[in-house]
Protein backbone atom coordinates (compact mmCIF):
# COMPACT_ATOMS: atom_id res chain seq x y z
CA UNK A 1 0.00 0.00 0.00
CA UNK A 2 1.15 3.54 -0.80
CA UNK A 3 0.36 6.34 1.64
CA UNK A 4 0.60 9.80 0.14
CA UNK A 5 0.34 13.23 1.75
CA UNK A 6 -0.17 13.51 5.51
CA UNK A 7 2.49 13.69 8.24
CA UNK A 8 4.23 10.43 9.15
CA UNK A 9 5.70 9.71 12.58
CA UNK A 10 9.34 8.65 12.18
CA UNK A 11 10.01 7.70 15.80
CA UNK A 12 10.84 11.17 17.06
CA UNK A 13 8.66 13.59 15.10
CA UNK A 14 6.51 14.01 12.02
CA UNK A 15 7.74 14.26 8.43
CA UNK A 16 5.83 14.71 5.22
CA UNK A 17 4.78 11.44 3.62
CA UNK A 18 6.89 10.35 0.66
CA UNK A 19 5.17 8.85 -2.37
CA UNK A 20 6.76 5.42 -2.06
CA UNK A 21 5.58 1.84 -1.95
CA UNK A 22 3.45 -0.35 -4.14
CA UNK A 23 -0.22 -1.18 -4.44
CA UNK A 24 -3.33 0.82 -3.68
CA UNK A 25 -2.97 4.50 -2.83
CA UNK A 26 -4.23 5.89 0.49
CA UNK A 27 -4.40 9.67 0.61
CA UNK A 28 -3.51 10.80 4.13
CA UNK A 29 -4.10 14.51 3.57
CA UNK A 30 -5.19 16.13 6.83
CA UNK A 31 -3.94 13.18 8.88
CA UNK A 32 -1.10 12.12 11.11
CA UNK A 33 0.21 8.68 10.14
CA UNK A 34 1.43 6.78 13.19
CA UNK A 35 2.40 3.16 13.87
CA UNK A 36 -0.30 0.72 14.91
CA UNK A 37 -1.04 1.07 18.61
CA UNK A 38 0.13 -1.61 21.06
CA UNK A 39 -1.93 -2.14 24.23
CA UNK A 40 -0.08 -4.24 26.80
CA UNK A 41 -2.62 -3.92 29.61
CA UNK A 42 -6.35 -4.24 29.04
CA UNK A 43 -8.94 -6.92 29.70
CA UNK A 44 -11.61 -6.82 27.01
CA UNK A 45 -14.31 -4.95 25.11
CA UNK A 46 -17.70 -5.42 23.44
CA UNK A 47 -18.83 -7.83 26.15
CA UNK A 48 -15.79 -10.10 25.79
CA UNK A 49 -12.86 -10.61 28.17
CA UNK A 50 -9.58 -12.49 27.84
CA UNK A 51 -10.61 -14.44 30.93
CA UNK A 52 -13.64 -15.87 29.13
CA UNK A 53 -11.02 -18.28 27.84
CA UNK A 54 -12.56 -18.79 24.40
CA UNK A 55 -11.50 -18.18 20.84
CA UNK A 56 -14.77 -16.36 20.24
CA UNK A 57 -14.00 -13.84 22.98
CA UNK A 58 -10.49 -13.29 21.66
CA UNK A 59 -11.84 -12.79 18.15
CA UNK A 60 -14.34 -10.19 19.38
CA UNK A 61 -11.59 -8.37 21.25
CA UNK A 62 -9.07 -8.50 18.42
CA UNK A 63 -11.58 -7.30 15.83
CA UNK A 64 -12.75 -4.33 17.91
CA UNK A 65 -9.24 -3.32 18.94
CA UNK A 66 -8.06 -3.35 15.33
CA UNK A 67 -10.96 -1.12 14.32
CA UNK A 68 -9.77 1.38 16.95
CA UNK A 69 -6.18 1.37 15.69
CA UNK A 70 -4.81 -1.11 18.24
CA UNK A 71 -3.13 -3.54 15.87
CA UNK A 72 -1.17 -5.55 18.47
CA UNK A 73 -2.66 -6.69 21.77
CA UNK A 74 -1.32 -8.14 25.01
CA UNK A 75 -4.47 -8.48 27.14
CA UNK A 76 -4.34 -9.07 30.88
CA UNK A 77 -5.71 -11.80 33.08
CA UNK A 78 -7.36 -11.20 36.42
CA UNK A 79 -6.66 -13.03 39.68
CA UNK A 80 -7.91 -16.61 39.31
CA UNK A 81 -6.86 -20.13 40.39
CA UNK A 82 -4.21 -21.87 38.29
CA UNK A 83 -6.71 -24.20 36.59
CA UNK A 84 -8.75 -21.26 35.30
CA UNK A 85 -5.62 -19.36 34.23
CA UNK A 86 -4.36 -22.44 32.36
CA UNK A 87 -7.54 -22.55 30.30
CA UNK A 88 -7.15 -18.87 29.46
CA UNK A 89 -3.56 -19.48 28.38
CA UNK A 90 -4.50 -22.43 26.18
CA UNK A 91 -7.15 -20.35 24.42
CA UNK A 92 -4.59 -17.61 23.80
CA UNK A 93 -2.06 -20.09 22.41
CA UNK A 94 -4.66 -21.46 19.98
CA UNK A 95 -5.80 -18.05 18.71
CA UNK A 96 -4.94 -17.02 15.14
CA UNK A 97 -6.25 -13.64 13.94
CA UNK A 98 -8.24 -13.26 10.75
CA UNK A 99 -7.61 -10.43 8.29
CA UNK A 100 -9.53 -7.84 10.32
CA UNK A 101 -8.26 -8.82 13.78
CA UNK A 102 -5.35 -7.45 15.78
CA UNK A 103 -2.36 -9.70 16.38
CA UNK A 104 -2.22 -11.34 19.80
CA UNK A 105 1.43 -10.69 20.67
CA UNK A 106 1.35 -11.56 24.35
CA UNK A 107 -0.54 -12.15 27.58
CA UNK A 108 -0.16 -10.02 30.69
CA UNK A 109 -0.60 -11.87 34.02
CA UNK A 110 -1.96 -9.17 36.32
CA UNK A 111 -2.68 -11.70 39.07
CA UNK A 112 -2.51 -13.70 41.28
CA UNK A 113 0.89 -12.69 42.77
CA UNK A 114 -0.33 -9.40 44.26
CA UNK A 115 -1.05 -7.89 47.67
CA UNK A 116 -4.44 -8.52 49.29
CA UNK A 117 -4.07 -5.06 50.84
CA UNK A 118 -4.03 -3.31 47.44
CA UNK A 119 -6.46 -5.59 45.69
CA UNK A 120 -8.26 -3.01 43.56
CA UNK A 121 -10.83 -4.82 41.42
CA UNK A 122 -9.05 -8.19 41.70
CA UNK A 123 -10.66 -11.08 43.59
CA UNK A 124 -8.94 -11.49 47.00
CA UNK A 125 -10.03 -15.12 47.27
CA UNK A 126 -7.44 -16.20 44.71
CA UNK A 127 -4.42 -14.09 45.68
CA UNK A 128 -1.34 -16.20 46.37
CA UNK A 129 2.39 -15.88 46.97
CA UNK A 130 4.64 -15.87 43.89
CA UNK A 131 5.24 -19.35 42.48
CA UNK A 132 7.84 -19.79 39.75
CA UNK A 133 6.84 -23.38 38.99
CA UNK A 134 3.23 -22.29 38.50
CA UNK A 135 4.30 -19.49 36.16
CA UNK A 136 6.34 -21.91 34.08
CA UNK A 137 3.36 -24.26 33.80
CA UNK A 138 1.17 -21.38 32.65
CA UNK A 139 3.83 -20.21 30.21
CA UNK A 140 3.90 -23.71 28.72
CA UNK A 141 0.11 -23.67 28.38
CA UNK A 142 0.35 -20.28 26.67
CA UNK A 143 2.95 -21.46 24.20
CA UNK A 144 5.37 -18.80 25.41
CA UNK A 145 2.91 -15.91 25.09
CA UNK A 146 3.20 -14.67 28.68
CA UNK A 147 5.17 -11.42 28.29
CA UNK A 148 4.40 -9.60 31.55
CA UNK A 149 3.86 -10.83 35.11
CA UNK A 150 2.71 -8.51 37.88
CA UNK A 151 3.98 -8.99 41.40
CA UNK A 152 3.82 -7.28 44.79
CA UNK A 153 7.48 -7.30 45.86
CA UNK A 154 6.74 -7.11 49.60
CA UNK A 155 5.05 -10.53 49.59
CA UNK A 156 6.78 -13.66 50.85
CA UNK A 157 9.22 -15.08 48.32
CA UNK A 158 8.77 -12.22 45.85
CA UNK A 159 12.42 -11.22 45.52
CA UNK A 160 13.50 -14.84 45.05
CA UNK A 161 10.77 -15.18 42.40
CA UNK A 162 12.13 -12.13 40.58
CA UNK A 163 15.67 -13.56 40.74
CA UNK A 164 14.47 -16.79 39.18
CA UNK A 165 12.08 -15.45 36.53
CA UNK A 166 13.39 -12.04 35.42
CA UNK A 167 15.36 -13.55 32.52
CA UNK A 168 12.29 -15.43 31.27
CA UNK A 169 9.52 -12.82 31.48
CA UNK A 170 9.23 -9.10 32.21
CA UNK A 171 8.36 -8.46 35.85
CA UNK A 172 6.14 -5.49 36.67
CA UNK A 173 5.33 -4.26 40.18
CA UNK A 174 1.61 -3.95 40.84
CA UNK A 175 -1.15 -3.94 43.45
CA UNK A 176 1.48 -3.37 46.09
CA UNK A 177 2.07 -1.79 49.50
CA UNK A 178 5.83 -1.75 48.93
CA UNK A 179 7.82 1.15 50.32
CA UNK A 180 10.72 2.89 48.60
CA UNK A 181 13.40 0.48 49.83
CA UNK A 182 11.42 -2.64 48.96
CA UNK A 183 10.72 -1.28 45.49
CA UNK A 184 14.38 -0.45 44.94
CA UNK A 185 15.30 -3.97 45.97
CA UNK A 186 12.81 -5.42 43.48
CA UNK A 187 14.38 -3.41 40.66
CA UNK A 188 17.86 -4.47 41.76
CA UNK A 189 16.71 -8.09 41.58
CA UNK A 190 15.40 -7.63 38.02
CA UNK A 191 11.90 -6.13 37.95
CA UNK A 192 11.67 -3.59 35.13
CA UNK A 193 8.18 -2.06 35.12
CA UNK A 194 5.59 -0.33 37.29
CA UNK A 195 1.97 -1.25 36.54
CA UNK A 196 -0.63 1.53 36.17
CA UNK A 197 1.44 4.26 37.81
CA UNK A 198 -0.22 5.93 40.84
CA UNK A 199 -2.99 3.31 41.00
CA UNK A 200 -3.00 0.43 43.54
CA UNK A 201 0.25 1.54 45.19
CA UNK A 202 1.34 3.88 48.00
CA UNK A 203 1.12 7.52 46.93
CA UNK A 204 4.04 9.89 46.57
CA UNK A 205 4.88 11.40 49.99
CA UNK A 206 7.78 13.60 51.02
CA UNK A 207 8.75 11.41 54.01
CA UNK A 208 7.52 8.06 52.69
CA UNK A 209 8.45 8.23 49.00
CA UNK A 210 7.10 4.80 48.05
CA UNK A 211 7.45 3.04 44.69
CA UNK A 212 7.19 6.03 42.35
CA UNK A 213 10.57 7.70 43.06
CA UNK A 214 12.22 4.28 43.19
CA UNK A 215 11.01 3.70 39.65
CA UNK A 216 11.91 7.05 38.10
CA UNK A 217 15.44 6.92 39.58
CA UNK A 218 16.25 3.96 37.34
CA UNK A 219 16.73 4.49 33.62
CA UNK A 220 15.87 0.85 32.88
CA UNK A 221 12.37 0.92 34.40
CA UNK A 222 9.22 1.84 32.47
CA UNK A 223 5.89 2.95 33.89
CA UNK A 224 2.39 2.17 32.63
CA UNK A 225 -0.18 4.94 32.84
CA UNK A 226 -3.96 4.91 32.32
CA UNK A 227 -4.82 8.15 30.50
CA UNK A 228 -8.59 7.75 30.43
CA UNK A 229 -9.57 10.97 32.20
CA UNK A 230 -10.77 9.02 35.25
CA UNK A 231 -7.84 7.27 36.89
CA UNK A 232 -5.36 10.17 36.97
CA UNK A 233 -5.54 13.97 37.08
CA UNK A 234 -3.98 15.69 34.04
CA UNK A 235 -1.34 17.38 36.23
CA UNK A 236 -0.15 13.97 37.45
CA UNK A 237 0.02 12.72 33.87
CA UNK A 238 2.22 15.68 32.94
CA UNK A 239 4.40 15.08 35.99
CA UNK A 240 4.87 11.43 35.04
CA UNK A 241 6.02 12.27 31.52
CA UNK A 242 8.44 14.88 32.87
CA UNK A 243 9.84 12.57 35.55
CA UNK A 244 10.22 9.46 33.42
CA UNK A 245 10.68 11.02 29.99
CA UNK A 246 8.73 9.93 26.95
CA UNK A 247 11.00 6.93 26.28
CA UNK A 248 9.91 5.25 29.53
CA UNK A 249 6.17 5.89 29.59
CA UNK A 250 3.71 3.23 28.39
CA UNK A 251 0.13 4.32 27.82
CA UNK A 252 -2.43 1.61 28.56
CA UNK A 253 -6.21 1.55 28.47
CA UNK A 254 -6.89 -1.07 31.21
CA UNK A 255 -10.25 -1.42 29.47
CA UNK A 256 -12.79 -4.04 30.53
CA UNK A 257 -15.59 -5.81 28.69
CA UNK A 258 -17.98 -2.82 28.84
CA UNK A 259 -15.78 -0.86 26.43
CA UNK A 260 -17.75 -0.10 23.29
CA UNK A 261 -21.10 -0.86 24.97
CA UNK A 262 -23.77 1.13 26.77
CA UNK A 263 -23.74 1.96 30.47
CA UNK A 264 -24.75 -0.92 32.72
CA UNK A 265 -23.48 -3.63 35.05
CA UNK A 266 -20.75 -5.94 33.74
CA UNK A 267 -18.49 -8.69 35.06
CA UNK A 268 -14.78 -8.19 35.73
CA UNK A 269 -12.91 -11.06 37.33
CA UNK A 270 -16.09 -12.46 38.85
CA UNK A 271 -17.21 -9.15 40.35
CA UNK A 272 -19.98 -6.78 39.26
CA UNK A 273 -18.79 -3.49 37.81
CA UNK A 274 -21.12 -0.55 37.20
CA UNK A 275 -20.22 1.53 34.15
CA UNK A 276 -21.37 5.11 33.61
CA UNK A 277 -19.60 6.81 30.75
CA UNK A 278 -15.85 6.25 31.20
CA UNK A 279 -16.22 5.46 34.91
CA UNK A 280 -16.25 1.79 35.95
CA UNK A 281 -16.60 1.01 39.66
CA UNK A 282 -17.25 -1.79 42.10
CA UNK A 283 -20.12 -1.49 44.57
CA UNK A 284 -17.80 0.16 47.12
CA UNK A 285 -16.72 2.82 44.63
CA UNK A 286 -13.35 1.28 43.77
CA UNK A 287 -12.36 2.11 40.19
CA UNK A 288 -12.43 -1.14 38.21
CA UNK A 289 -10.54 -0.73 34.97
CA UNK A 290 -11.70 1.63 32.26
CA UNK A 291 -14.37 1.72 29.57
CA UNK A 292 -12.27 3.32 26.86
CA UNK A 293 -9.66 2.26 24.30
CA UNK A 294 -6.00 3.13 23.76
CA UNK A 295 -6.70 5.49 20.85
CA UNK A 296 -9.02 7.51 23.09
CA UNK A 297 -6.38 7.49 25.84
CA UNK A 298 -3.79 8.86 23.43
CA UNK A 299 -6.19 11.59 22.35
CA UNK A 300 -7.02 12.51 25.96
CA UNK A 301 -3.34 12.66 26.92
CA UNK A 302 -2.68 15.16 24.13
CA UNK A 303 -5.83 17.25 24.24
CA UNK A 304 -6.57 17.29 27.98
CA UNK A 305 -3.22 16.62 29.68
CA UNK A 306 -1.13 18.66 27.21
CA UNK A 307 1.27 15.82 26.43
CA UNK A 308 3.09 16.48 23.13
CA UNK A 309 1.65 14.32 20.36
CA UNK A 310 5.07 12.87 19.59
CA UNK A 311 5.48 11.77 23.22
CA UNK A 312 2.02 10.24 23.42
CA UNK A 313 2.57 8.32 20.18
CA UNK A 314 5.84 6.87 21.49
CA UNK A 315 4.09 5.84 24.69
CA UNK A 316 1.36 4.00 22.76
CA UNK A 317 3.52 2.35 20.09
CA UNK A 318 7.30 1.96 20.35
CA UNK A 319 7.54 1.89 24.13
CA UNK A 320 4.98 -0.85 24.81
CA UNK A 321 6.36 -2.90 21.92
CA UNK A 322 9.84 -2.65 23.43
CA UNK A 323 8.55 -3.40 26.94
CA UNK A 324 7.22 -6.81 25.92
CA UNK A 325 9.99 -7.59 23.45
CA UNK A 326 8.12 -7.34 20.15
CA UNK A 327 9.80 -4.16 18.92
CA UNK A 328 11.70 -6.02 16.19
CA UNK A 329 8.36 -6.41 14.38
CA UNK A 330 6.11 -3.65 15.74
CA UNK A 331 5.93 -0.16 17.15
CA UNK A 332 7.39 1.78 14.21
CA UNK A 333 6.80 2.52 10.54
CA UNK A 334 9.99 1.30 8.93
CA UNK A 335 11.23 -1.39 6.52
CA UNK A 336 11.18 -4.91 7.89
CA UNK A 337 8.40 -4.35 10.40
CA UNK A 338 4.76 -5.37 10.18
CA UNK A 339 2.88 -2.89 7.99
CA UNK A 340 0.50 -1.55 10.64
CA UNK A 341 -0.46 2.12 10.66
CA UNK A 342 -3.16 4.41 11.98
CA UNK A 343 -4.32 7.63 10.35
CA UNK A 344 -5.43 10.19 12.93
CA UNK A 345 -7.42 13.25 11.97
CA UNK A 346 -4.97 16.14 12.36
CA UNK A 347 -7.56 18.33 14.08
CA UNK A 348 -9.50 15.94 16.31
CA UNK A 349 -7.00 13.06 16.65
CA UNK A 350 -9.86 10.66 15.97
CA UNK A 351 -9.01 7.43 14.14
CA UNK A 352 -9.82 7.93 10.47
CA UNK A 353 -8.23 4.85 8.87
CA UNK A 354 -6.38 1.72 10.02
CA UNK A 355 -3.85 -0.21 7.96
CA UNK A 356 -3.50 -3.74 9.34
CA UNK A 357 -0.69 -5.94 8.02
CA UNK A 358 -0.59 -3.89 4.82
CA UNK A 359 -4.35 -3.87 4.21
CA UNK A 360 -6.78 -1.01 4.72
CA UNK A 361 -9.53 -2.02 7.13
CA UNK A 362 -13.01 -1.33 5.80
Question: Can you annotate each of these PLM segments?
Answer:
Residues 1-25, 348, 355, 359:
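N-terminal metal-binding scaffold of metallo-dependent hydrolase/deaminase domains
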Residues 6, 322, 332-362:
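C-terminal cap of metal-dependent C-N hydrolases
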Residues 30, 41, 65, 109, ...:
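Conserved, mostly hydrophobic/aromatic
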Residues 43, 59-88, 102-115, 142-156, ...:
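Divalent metal-dependent hydrolysis catalytic cores, especially in the metallo-beta-lactamase
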Residues 63-74, 115-143, 185-197, 201, ...:
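Active-site gating loops and adjacent loop-to-helix segments of metal-dependent hydrolytic enzymes
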Residues 136, 140-261, 361:
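Active-site core of metal-dependent hydrolases
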Residues 213-223, 229, 241-253, 258-344:
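His/Asp/Glu-enriched, well-ordered alpha-helical/loop segment
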Amino acid sequence: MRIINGSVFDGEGFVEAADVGDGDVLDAAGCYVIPGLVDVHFHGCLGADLCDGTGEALSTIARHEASRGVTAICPATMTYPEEKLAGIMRAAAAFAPTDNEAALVGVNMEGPFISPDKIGAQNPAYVQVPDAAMLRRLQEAAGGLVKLVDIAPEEEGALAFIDEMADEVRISLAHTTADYDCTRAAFEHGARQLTHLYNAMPPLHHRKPGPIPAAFERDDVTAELIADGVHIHPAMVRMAFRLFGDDRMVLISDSMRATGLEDGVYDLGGQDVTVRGNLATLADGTIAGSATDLAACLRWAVREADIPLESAVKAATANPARAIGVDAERGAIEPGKVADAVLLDAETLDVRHVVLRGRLLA
